[in-house]
Amino acid sequence: MDKKWSLEQRWLHLLNQQFLDCLNHLFNHYRRLSTFQKPPSIIRHMFSVLALAIQILANVNVVAQTTEAVDLAPPPKVRQIRIPGDILIGGVFPVHSKSLNGDEPCGEIAETRGVHRVEAMLYALDQINSQNDFLRGYKLGALILDSCSNPAYALNQSLDFVRDMIGSSEASDYVCLDGSDPNLKKQSQKKNVAAVVGGSYSSVSVQLANLLRLFRIAQVSPASTNADLSDKNRFEYFARTVPSDDYQAMAMVEIAVKFKWSYVSLVYSADEYGELGADAFKKEARKKGICIALEERIQNKKESFTESINNLVQKLQPEKNVGATVVVLFVGTEYIPDILRYTAERMKLTSGAKKRIIWLASESWDRNNDKYTAGDNRLAAQGAIVLMLASQKVPSFEEYFMSLHPGTEAFERNKWLRELWQVKYKCEFDTPPGSTASRCEDIKQSTEGFNADDKVQFVIDAVYAIAHGLQSMKQAICPDDAIENHWISRYSKQPEICHAMQNIDGSDFYQNYLLKVNFTGKTISIFSSFRLSPFSDIVGKRFRFSPQGDGPASYTILTYKPKSMDKKRRMTDDESSPSDYVEIGHWSENNLTIYEKNLWWDPDHTPVSVCSLPCKIGFRKQLIKDEQCCWACSKCEDYEYLINETHCVGCEQGWWPTKDRKGCFDLSLSQLKYMRWRSMYSLVPTILAVFGIIATLFVIVVYVIYNETPVVKASGRELSYILLISMIMCYCMTFVLLSKPSAIVCAIKRTGIGFAFSCLYSAMFVKTNRIFRIFSTRSAQRPRFISPISQVVMTAMLAGVQLIGSLIWLSVVPPGWRHHYPTRDQVVLTCNVPDHHFLYSLAYDGFLIVLCTTYAVKTRKVPENFNETKFIGFSMYTTCVVWLSWIFFFFGTGSDFQIQTSSLCISISMSANVALACIFSPKLWIILFEKHKNVRKQEGESMLNKSSRSLGNCSSRLCANSIDEPNQYTALLTDSTRRRSSRKTSQPTSTSSAHDTFL
């Protein structure tokens, strides 16, 4: 027997898919044929029988794949409940859980997911049937089946929905002359199923939809969220009052993004719900940059179930699954308690232990299931974040359910209530007298601790949608039909309904009526081309089907936060709130709202679930093996910004990264650098220049006061004033150099410095050149161009060369400013010529310095009274040292414009200071402190003799004009002395050209 059954299994596995494809092809051909004429009834019967046979084969195939049993176990005692009515609505609910024992198809009775949903459907039918004007006298009945949470068993049970259709007499053997079907009275009492509410599990709904689509029966699920069920090419008669898992996956991903959980583990069950939900989550996670650290599949077979959970918990250990503290759950309801139990045991969780795992669970998490939080399970479940389809409680239903009591009609019509009572209250029905067993008839329900199933509202919405679709269809195709007005209904126990409503075309009903149901506020409206039919919604919730037949996408986000383990909640929560689940947010149509005050963690201490911590500002991610969520941090260069998390790019010249390193800003707008007056680099040169100007002005004042004294005259007043003015010009250049660069400032800088130096050193050169010519001449004639006017003209001509050259330079390169970039992070406002061009301007001044130094060296041996050249020489030597030092200092600190500018200012001032001190300080000393040397002497014989000896080397031609042209030196002598000296010697004392050699 075993061997034979195995062969059949293999044969059916090979042929089942071909049969289903063939059947679909035949039915499509039948639909096209029926458009023109009705085929004989025998053909339609053959199609129906073939469809039934193929579904049985499919059922056997599914059973063979999901169980190892050879024979199907006997079904439970109560297979279905039937409520009479004019139009039947089917129902498929998981009244029993799935058995993990392969020998039995059904497990324990499920109160919330099973019995509550069955009663919700019956309650909705009662509400609709109680309104006499709704279907104008038609009553809705029900045929409700138990799926036992098993797809194969549910498919087998669902054949009852199509048996009535196969055995009905609507396929008449008679055809009217015009080719239409005859309108015959039905002889059979069997009723066709107009639509089916169910199933709950997606795997059950898929199998059910595959069967019902062959017979064009509409299906409305109140709980199945499988994304594939939205595919109208495969499930053209399927609708649901809940959203697709695609939306749930989007909500879960947005929660992870909200809390910055970029590295999570994913656990899913080996069924359509788990696998499709996991695929949807992975798809959305990739879009948001969330990585899957661990992906584990939970096997649903008994022998491999425990092993897969053990492996899962082992892999979730913190030392093995580093970083991923968040675990996303897409598993069946029945698997979660075992996962929690094994987690608590293997990880040795205690009430005071730090939470290691945060569950992010789909709506399959049953908050009303006590097994989830029994014993140590609550330690593992604490802090879990659970998505629940946004639903509202139905107080009238809860009141109705609490009124159910053995012996009442409402109780006895649902045979599964007896089983629930026996299991829940440990009692027995119909106990014999004297029995010690508790009597179920005496037990009444208590409202304490009662929580209706979360999907009661969706079951009621599904029944309402079907009912109002039927109402709209009846108004369209049987507008004048009313049972209470039909004469047969007055005398017949089987009232006759509209013929078009007896055999409903599922395709027409689904497309034109069911999908157009729209719940608005407290009313339900069916929009069609005929009428608007209002009806009160039992929960006042807006509802409508999407074009794919899905319900509104809205989720409530809960967290498991038991009072017994949460001191804060015990202090703040109302004692009347018994639930251990706290609402922490809501998600609807891509809109996530989180109530942070209800979270079990502080908003500033959100749990971390990442592979790598975020890089600091200025660091880029260096991905590890192309893993999007795992990286090492690498520092960017100071001048680089991040175009994304993994690439640094340098800013353009003159730009610098912002503080957040997300872009660059223009340095010239906020950090433009130029000499500031408050800077130490400006204060020192300014002070030096001010003191130099004051000292120079003091010398000028002294010279003006003592302008007619011998010392002032002997120093050469004209050139002395030129020298002093040139020094003031040098000092003033400091203020020009320290000013903010502009066209005018740059023009003065390019001309003023060179011109000031040219005036200074031209005058010195004229002085030393004249002395050299005087003492080096061998002729008796007086040297040319040694008069004061000649000296001034020569000085002006020499300085004019520099001025003309500077003006030509300005015309060739107009003055202006520019941005200079000494380093990547600096922008300096400077003049629009390079530094080496500035040296070209000073080259001429350097040439004058060299000439002055040369003549100073040549005239170093002149007589003592003509030793002013010694001071000029000392001034030139010092100036050369200053300028050589400045050149190396200036170009050696090319990256610091402040040092360059400050050193240039100091060098210019020092050049003027050296000239001022060396040339004028000896004269000032005599004028101010040795005044006896600055007067005319009446008796100057001794001086005359001394002078005569000093002038022994003068040529006779040079001294010939001494009587006619008195000079500064002879001004110190009296007229008589001068005459005596003139008579006594054949040579003149001196010429006017030697006036500045006195000192």
Curated annotation (Swiss-Prot):
Q: Chief subcellular site? A: membrane
Question: Can the keyword Membrane be found in this entry's annotation?
Answer: yes
Where do the record's glycosylation annotations fall on this chain?
518
Q: Report residues binding L-glutamate.
A: 202, 223-225, 273, 363, 455
Gene Ontology CC annotations of this record: plasma membrane
* A Pfam family it matches: NCD3G
Domain of life from the UniProt record: Eukaryota
Which InterPro entries does the record match to this protein?
ANF_lig-bd_rcpt, GPCR_3, GPCR_3_9-Cys_dom, GPCR_3_9-Cys_sf, GPCR_3_C, GPCR_3_CS, GPCR_3_mtglu_rcpt, mGluR
**Sorted alphabetically, which keywords does the UniProt record give?**
Cell membrane, G-protein coupled receptor, Glycoprotein, Membrane, Receptor, Transducer, Transmembrane, Transmembrane helix
Q: Write down the membrane topology.
A: Multi-pass membrane protein
Which parts of the chain span the membrane according to its record? 682-704, 719-739, 751-769, 792-812, 836-857, 871-893, 904-929
The record's comment on protein family reads: Belongs to the G-protein coupled receptor 3 family.
This chain belongs to which protein, by name?
Answer: Probable metabotropic glutamate receptor mgl-1
Record organism:
Caenorhabditis elegans
- Gene for this protein? mgl-1
